[in-house]
From Swiss-Prot:
Protein's gene: EFT1
Family per record: Belongs to the TRAFAC class translation factor GTPase superfamily. Classic translation factor GTPase family. EF-G/EF-2 subfamily.
Keyword Cytoplasm among UniProt keywords: yes
Species, as recorded: Debaryomyces hansenii (strain ATCC 36239 / CBS 767 / BCRC 21394 / JCM 1990 / NBRC 0083 / IGC 2968) (Yeast)
Record's protein name: Elongation factor 2
Function noted in UniProt: Catalyzes the GTP-dependent ribosomal translocation step during translation elongation. During this step, the ribosome changes from the pre-translocational (PRE) to the post-translocational (POST) state as the newly formed A-site-bound peptidyl-tRNA and P-site-bound deacylated tRNA move to the P and E sites, respectively. Catalyzes the coordinated movement of the two tRNA molecules, the mRNA and conformational changes in the ribosome.
C-alpha cells in the first residue's frame, strides 16, 4: 500500500515530465469504473477486497443505484516504477515517481458531453473494450472524439473472465477474438492520420494493449510476460515481446522459433501467445474452477504465487480471484502502459497547442502553452463545473496549460463569447482557493503549475459552463468544445406552488451550470424549457432539478422534440420587402444548402472564423460552389455559426457595406425563429440579389433595415417549398438471435428503419442497427425489453436531421398537425402565415 500525502503530490506537480493526464473512455457497461478501482486501490484509497465492486469514482447516489456513471470524476494517483520500466519511456523523465491524474468518464451516450469535457483536459486515453461485445457504437464515438482532440489512446480488452467462464472458448479462438477487436480499433484510428501525433495505432507486441478482467482485478500486457520469460530463459526482452504476438510458433522438440504453424513432420504447432501467455491462465482457470485440488499447489509453485494460510481455504471463484490478483495484478499492467506509452503534458502540449488555442500560433500565450511553461502568464481552460457540498456553489474544474495558478490571484475570467480588446463576457476577479480533485473529496493546495488538473473556488458566478482564465490581456480564448450530441428532447417545467417560482429559476440556473450539454430557456408564452440529449439524460437532469438544485415539487410536461425548418427548392419568385419608411428595398431569393455542406458547418470544417479565401477554396473544391459566391458569404446563422448562410450577389450597390451589420443581425434573428413555427432554421442559403437604399444615412439605420431583412427572409423561405426536419437517432442493439423478431416488430411500430444486421464472429450475439425518429423514441427501451424478454439493450445516438414528407402549411397533413399544435402551444395564431404577409408589392 502506498500511502501518499498531499505534499508529495504537490512536489510531483512541479516535475511536469512525470505527470500523466488521462481519461478512461468506453462503451456503456464495458467496465471503466470497475477498472479504475484497481488503480485507486493500488494508490491505497480503497481496500483490496472492495476493488471491482466499490466503483469509487461513481460518487453520486443515483450512480451507485443505477450502476452507471453519469458525471466524469477526477482523481490523482501516485505511482512509482522500477528503473527497467523507466528506461523504456520514449520521453524525458526525472526520477521514478509519477503522478497520474485520472478521469473516469461515463459510457452512456446521453452523457457524451461529459466525455468531451474530460478529454479536453487530458492528453491520453485508456480505451476499454469488452472482449465479448467488441467495438460498439459508443466506443467508436468516444475514440473519434479523443483523436479529434489529438489524444493518444492505449487499449485494454476487459471482461476476459467472461470469455473463459461463460463462452468456454479455446485458446486460438480467444487469440483471434483479441486480434479482431484490436484490428477494429486500429481501423478507426487509422482514419485520423496526424503527422504531429505520429502513429497512434495500438499493438500488443509494443505494449500498448492490455488484456484482463476488472471485476476479478487482474490484467496483463505482452510486455509483462516477455519480462518474465526473458529472466527465466536469459533471452532479450524486446525480441521476446515481438514473438509473443502474431504468427510466431515455438517448436519444443527442436527448441527453435518458426513462423509456420506446422513442423517438419506436419504436426500443428501452438502459437507462442497461446503457449506462453494464455496457457498458464487457462490452466489456473480449469484447475481451480473444476476443483482439482491436487494440481493447484504445483501450479502456484511454478508461477511463484504465495498464498496466506486463510487464502488456501478458499475455493471456486473466490480462490480464482485471489490467485489471479497475485499472479497478474491489474494495476501493474495499467500503470506500466499509462506511464510508458502516454505522453506527459510537456510532450503533448507541444502538438496540442495549435488545436487548443484560438489566437495566432506565434503569440506569447500559444508559445507558453507549447512549452508548458510554469513561469509564463497564466492560461487555464475550465471544461466543466462540479457541484460542491455547499448548495449552489461550484468548483470550476479545468487544466492549467501555462503559468501557475495561486490562491488569491487576480485573473481575467473570459467566457466563450469573449473577443480580444472587447469587454463582453469578461470579469477581472480573484481566485479564492485552488484545490485538488480527489474523487469524492477535495484537498486544498496553495498553487498549481502548468500541465496539471485543478479545481478553482470562487469563479463559478462568472462562468456559465466553460471558459478561459488568464492573466495576460492579449490572450485569446482556448477553443470551445464541440459536443458530438445535441439537445433534441425538451420538456416544459412548472411549479406546483406559485410561491416556489424564484426557487425554480435559481434551480434552472444551477442545472445549466452543472451539466455541459443541457439547455434551459424560457419560451414566449412564459414556460420554462429544459432541453437534453436523450431520455435518460433528461430523466437525470429533472431528478437533479427536483432534488438538488431547486428542491421543490414540479409539474413536468410530456417530452417535446425540437424540429428544424428548411426549404426544398429555390424561391419561385424574387421576394421583396420595403422598410417601414418605404425608402429602402431588399430583394432576395432562398435556396437549400446541400446536406454535406450543412454537416461540414456543424462539424466545424467550414468555420465562420476561417480566412474567407481558404473557406471559399473548400466550398469550391469539395462542394462545387461558385468561387465568387463562396467568397461573399456575409454570415452564418443562427448564433453566428449555424448551418444557414447569407450570400451577397449584388452588383454595384451604393452604401452596401453600411447596412451589412443590420442584415447580419436580422438574419440571426430570422434563423433563430423561423416563419413556420418559431424553430431554428437549417440548411437555407439566402442570396441578396439587389438592394435599393436611401441616400441619407439617417433613413437607412438599423431600425429600418433589420425588420425589413427579417421579413424578406421569411417571404423567400415561404416561397421556396418550406419543409420541416425531425431529428433521427441511430439505434444499435446487441441481442441473441431469438430476440431479433421482437426488435423488428417494435421498430416497425415506431417508424424505425433497419439499416444493418450482422453476427459478431465467435459469439452468439447479433448487432442490429436502425434509424429511429426521436419523436418515437420515448419508452422505446422499455418496450424493447418487454418484447424480447429483457435480452436486447438499445443505444441511441443522435445521428441526423431528416425531412418530414408533407406540406407544413397545409393544416390537414400529418406535418401540418404537428405545426399547428406547436404554434398553439407557443401562443401564435394556429395557421401558418402566407408569404403575402411578409412580401411587399413594388
Amino acid at each position: 500500500m502506498v500511502a501518499f500525502t498531499i505534499e508529495q503530490i504537490r512536489e510531483l506537480m512541479d516535475k511536469v515530465t512525470n505527470v500523466r493526464n488521462m481519461s478512461v473512455i468506453a462503451h456503456v457497461d464495458h467496465g471503466k469504473s470497475t477498472l479504475t478501482d484497481s488503480l485507486v486501490q493500488r494508490a491505497g484509497i480503497i481496500s483490496a477486497a472492495k476493488a471491482g465492486e466499490a466503483r469509487f469514482t461513481d460518487t453520486r447516489k443515483d450512480e451507485q443505484e443505477r450502476g452507471i456513471t453519469i458525471k466524469s470524476t477526477a482523481i490523482s494517483l501516485y505511482a512509482s516504477m522500477t528503473d527497467d520500466d523507466c528506461k523504456e519511456i520514449q520521453q524525458k523523465t526525472v526520477g521514478n515517481s509519477f503522478l497520474i491524474n485520472l478521469i473516469d468518464s461515463p459510457g452512456h451516450v446521453d452523457f457524451s458531453s461529459e466525455v468531451t469535457a474530460a478529454l479536453r483536459v487530458t492528453d491520453g486515453a485508456l480505451v476499454v473494450v469488452d472482449c465479448v461485445e467488441g467495438v460498439c457504437v459508443q466506443t467508436e464515438t468516444v475514440l473519434r472524439q479523443a483523436l479529434g482532440e489529438r489524444i493518444k489512446p492505449v487499449v485494454i480488452i476487459n471482461k476476459v473472465d467472461r470469455a473463459l467462464l461463460e463462452l468456454q472458448v479455446t485458446k486460438e479462438d480467444l487469440y483471434q477474438s483479441f486480434s479482431r477487436t484490436i484490428e477494429s480499433v486500429n481501423v478507426i484510428i487509422s482514419t485520423y492520420v496526424d503527422s504531429s501525433l505520429g502513429d497512434s495505432q495500438v499493438y500488443p507486441d509494443k505494449g500498448t494493449v492490455a488484456f484482463g478482467s476488472g471485476l476479478h482485478g487482474w490484467a496483463f500486457t505482452v510486455r509483462q510476460f516477455a519480462t518474465r520469460y526473458s529472466k527465466k530463459f536469459g533471452v532479450d526482452r524486446i525480441k521476446m515481446m515481438e514473438r509473443l504476438w502474431g504468427d510466431s510458433y515455438f517448436n519444443p522438440k527442436t527448441k527453435k522459433w518458426t513462423n509456420k504453424d506446422k513442423d517438419a513432420e506436419g504436426k500443428t504447432l501452438e502459437r507462442a501467445f497461446n503457449m506462453f501467455v494464455l496457457d498458464p491462465i487457462f490452466r489456473l482457470f480449469s484447475s481451480i474452477m473444476n476443483f482439482k485440488k491436487s494440481e493447484i499447489p504445483t501450479l502456484l509453485e511454478k508461477l511463484e504465487i504465495n498464498l496466506k494460510a486463510e487464502e488456501k481455504e478458499l475455493e471456486g471463484k473466490a480462490l480464482l480471484k485471489v490467485v489471479m490478483r497475485k499472479f497478474l495484478p491489474a494495476a501493474d499492467a495499467l500503470l506500466e502502459m499509462i506511464v510508458i506509452h502516454l505522453p506527459s503534458p510537456v510532450t503533448a502540449q507541444a502538438y496540442r497547442a495549435e488545436t487548443l488555442y484560438e489566437g495566432p500560433a506565434d503569440d506569447a500565450s500559444c508559445i507558453a502553452i507549447k512549452n508548458c511553461d510554469p513561469t509564463a502568464d497564466l492560461m487555464v481552460y475550465i471544461s466543466k463545473m462540479v457541484p460542491t457540498s455547499d448548495k449552489g456553489r461550484f468548483y470550476a474544474f479545468g487544466r492549467v496549460f501555462a503559468g501557475t495558478v495561486k490562491s488569491g490571484q487576480k485573473v481575467r475570467i473570459q467566457g466563450p463569447n469573449y473577443q480580444v480588446g472587447k469587454k463582453d463576457d469578461l470579469f477581472v476577479k480573484a481566485i479564492q482557493r485552488t484545490v485538488l480533485m480527489m474523487g469524492r473529496f477535495v484537498e486544498a493546495i496553495d498553487d498549481c503549475p502548468a500541465g496539471n488538473i485543478v479545481g478553482l473556488v470562487g469563479v463559478d458566478q462568472f462562468l456559465l459552463k466553460s471558459g478561459t482564465i488568464t492573466t495576460n490581456e492579449a490572450s485569446h480564448n482556448m477553443k470551445v468544445m464541440k459536443f458530438s450530441v445535441s439537445p433534441v428532447v425538451q420538456v416544459a417545467v412548472e411549479v406546483k406552488n406559485a410561491n416556489d417560482l424564484p426557487k425554480l429559476v435559481e434551480g434552472l440556473k444551477r442545472l445549466s451550470k452543472s451539466d455541459p450539454c443541457v439547455l434551459t430557456s424560457m419560451s414566449e408564452s412564459g414556460e420554462h424549457i429544459v432541453a437534453a440529449t436523450g431520455e435518460l439524460h433528461l430523466e437525470i437532469c429533472l431528478s437533479d432539478l427536483q432534488n438538488d438544485h431547486a428542491g421543490i415539487p414540479l409539474k413536468i410536461s410530456p417530452p417535446i422534440v425540437s424540429y428544424r425548418e428548411t426549404v426544398n427548392a429555390e424561391s419561385s419568385m424574387v421576394a421583396l420587402s420595403k422598410s417601414p419608411n418605404k425608402h429602402n428595398r431588399i430583394y432576395v431569393k432562398a435556396q437549400p444548402i446541400d446536406e454535406e455542406v450543412s454537416l461540414d458547418i456543424e462539424k466545424g470544417v467550414i468555420n465562420p472564423r476561417d480566412d474567407f479565401k481558404a473557406r471559399a477554396r473548400i466550398l469550391a473544391d469539395n462542394h462545387g460552389w461558385d468561387v465568387t459566391d463562396a467568397r461573399k458569404i456575409w454570415c452564418f446563422g443562427p448564433d453566428g455559426n449555424g448551418p444557414n448562410l447569407v450570400v451577397d450577389q449584388t452588383k454595384a450597390v451604393q452604401y452596401l457595406n453600411e447596412i451589412k451589420d443590420s442584415v447580419v443581425a436580422a438574419f440571426q434573428w430570422a434563423t433563430k425563429e423561423g416563419p413556420i413555427f418559431g424553430e431554428n432554421v437549417r440548411s437555407v442559403r439566402v442570396n441578396i440579389l439587389d438592394v435599393t437604399l436611401h441616400a441619407d444615412a439617417i433613413h437607412r439605420g438599423g431600425g429600418q433595415i433589420i425588420p425589413t431583412m427579417r421579413r424578406v427572409t421569411y417571404a423567400s423561405m415561404l416561397l421556396a417549398e418550406p419543409a420541416i426536419q425531425e431529428p433521427v437517432f441511430l439505434v444499435e442493439i446487441q441481442c441473441p438471435e431469438n430476440a431479433i423478431g421482437g426488435i423488428y416488430s417494435v421498430l416497425n411500430k415506431k417508424r424505425g428503419q433497419v439499416i444493418s444486421e450482422e453476427q459478431r464472429p465467435g459469439t452468439p450475439l447479433f448487432t442490429v442497427k436502425a434509424y429511429l425518429p426521436v419523436n418515437e423514441s420515448f419508452g422505446f427501451s422499455g418496450e424493447l425489453r418487454q418484447s424480447t424478454g429483457g435480452q436486447a439493450f438499445p443505444q441511441l445516438i443522435f445521428d441526423h436531421w431528416a425531412n418530414l414528407n408533407g406540406d407544413p402549411t397545409d393544416p390537414t397533413s400529418k406535418v401540418g398537425t404537428i405545426v399547428k399544435e406547436k404554434r398553439e402551444r407557443q401562443g401564435m395564431k394556429p395557421d401558418v402565415p402566407g408569404y403575402e404577409e411578409y412580401y411587399d408589392k413594388l
